[in-house]
Amino acid sequence: MKKFRLFLVMAILVPFLSSCSYNTMVEKREAVTGQWAQVEDSYQRRMDLIGNLVETVKGAAKHENETLTAVINARANATKVTIDPTNLTEDNIKAYQMAQNNLTEALSKLMVVHEQYPDLKVNQNFLELQAQLEGTENRISVERKKFNTMAQDYNTTISTFP
């Protein structure tokens, strides 16, 4: 009779514990997906600011067509690379990050250009956009760190699933 009770208790507990573990994995997967949306949102904000920044620089730095074209092209290429949040593979994330890095490089060249034009140094719109862009870059960094932490936690959970 004791063996039967033990078997009955195990028969009830094992599925219950398994469903709890499964639910935890689903919750963590959804958290990773949600955090990736935050990362993409931060990058989108940067894209929007860059468009405004390019328009501001166009007016003051008419001789910098090459730099402006590089930023515009990098921005266009970065918007072409998208990731389906339900398909976050390492290759997809690398391609997305490469496009974002190319945009960052082009943007840094644009920031160097502004030093050569006194009109831009005092242009209030440019200064505000530059400050917002710096804040957005910090936000991107924070959101990416959160994403990496959540992804690592999720990966640990699924690799140690009983």
What residues fall within each predicted segment?
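A helix-centric hydrophobic-segment signal that preferentially recognizes long
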Residues: 2-162
